């Protein structure tokens, strides 16, 4: 029997507010345990929650970015369960009337070497507070509780079960990760837990429209773990069904060392949490004016820019996807193209190639690229006008990078930089290509005279001989001859 995988994701994005969702305590990462837990976070008697306006605004921003409905009123509810790192005995979340309802994510999936577009529908995105953290490693026979994270604002983004493979799930998660950083609502730091995924996975006979029993894999904090966990879980469920067994609805954890999921507990349903409206929080009213105000502050979104890059610049879907994976990359690329609009593909190749490689090697982001877009564009112009070859350009780029300095200053503040840096390096080292036809003809004549055997081999039909002669001409010119011109002159001389 052939099986179809069905996947839905629940993503917890930590919102980039400086204070918590219902208290004034700091959300900064890395403080000593319990140093950033106030009376509200500790659930001391008599304290009351006060809603953080910034968290609501970020939720609205997300809803507008995905074409969702913004609910007004929106209701906060108590989600009741017991766990040591949940001091109140309940979590303030949303059940009925979340802030964001519906919407969709458009993504590009590269699978089996093919590029395809897919739309994943969203069920909702609701606000909630994070729980604390249980610490087991540093204690013998007991656990420690760190409540710094308790009360941190989260936006839980719930998708419909529209994904059919781990590749689609990873593409969705990456697209969502890009979006929340792009619109400035989450820093997306997966190592610090700012962006975590829960995957709901089931399988069913191919062609069936009935959903199978799902298992939820919790707290996947890397795209690689997300892919591996889904692939393992699909294999596990298929093996059970093909052996005549049945799938138990469970919450499972992924063990990255063993590359497998293991049961954590039986999976709860909504009624197990006994949701009811929180009596300490009034229904949230979101005015049309507030929504319009947030809408005006939205930047151009990644999907819109991808479409424009493909249409206006003639880039492939793959290139457009890479260039919109981060807002800083996209803005840097557009600034380079603004200086060299005649060749957006050449600009894309260098931004994704040399510039990305050097930044990655130094652990820097595009925001602090030491070369300004104008400096890079001038170098690319020298390739385009034949002043230097692509090979020499890479050496010039290396020297430009070294001379541009090591300070982490944004290229957006690069007024007064030496825009003639590429030309100075080229001229000071005599790197300009020989493009004079008569000079190149003399070089070709000398090489042909010195290599009669290769000439005879070419005339006998051996194309490798031409490459050898080409190499000899470039060697004689110390790499400074224009390769395209040399190729043309050499072929002409050999066929005379």
Swiss-Prot record:
Q: What is a GO molecular function of this protein?
A: ATP binding
- The EC category is ligase
For this protein, the record's Gene3D superfamilies field holds:
1.10.10.410, GatB domain, N-terminal subdomain (1.10.150.380)
Listed under catalytic activity are: L-glutamyl-tRNA(Gln) + L-glutamine + ATP + H2O = L-glutaminyl-tRNA(Gln) + L-glutamate + ADP + phosphate + H(+); L-aspartyl-tRNA(Asn) + L-glutamine + ATP + H2O = L-asparaginyl-tRNA(Asn) + L-glutamate + ADP + phosphate + 2 H(+)
Transmembrane segments annotated in the record for this chain: none
Fetch the InterPro entries from UniProt: Asn/Gln-tRNA_amidoTrfase_suB/E (IPR017959), Asn/Gln-tRNA_Trfase_suB/E_cat (IPR006075), Asn/Gln_amidotransferase (IPR018027), Asn/Gln_tRNA_amidoTrase-B-like (IPR003789), GatB (IPR004413), GatB_C_1 (IPR042114), GatB_Yqey_C_2 (IPR023168), Gln-tRNA_amidoTrfase_suB_CS (IPR017958)
Function description: Allows the formation of correctly charged Asn-tRNA(Asn) or Gln-tRNA(Gln) through the transamidation of misacylated Asp-tRNA(Asn) or Glu-tRNA(Gln) in organisms which lack either or both of asparaginyl-tRNA or glutaminyl-tRNA synthetases. The reaction takes place in the presence of glutamine and ATP through an activated phospho-Asp-tRNA(Asn) or phospho-Glu-tRNA(Gln).
The record's listing under HAMAP family reads: GatB (MF_00121)
Protein's name according to its UniProt entry? Aspartyl/glutamyl-tRNA(Asn/Gln) amidotransferase subunit B
Source species: Nitrosospira multiformis (strain ATCC 25196 / NCIMB 11849 / C 71)
From the broadest rank down, the organism's phylogenetic lineage runs: Bacteria, Pseudomonadati, Pseudomonadota, Betaproteobacteria, Nitrosomonadales
| Gene name, Swiss-Prot/TrEMBL | gatB
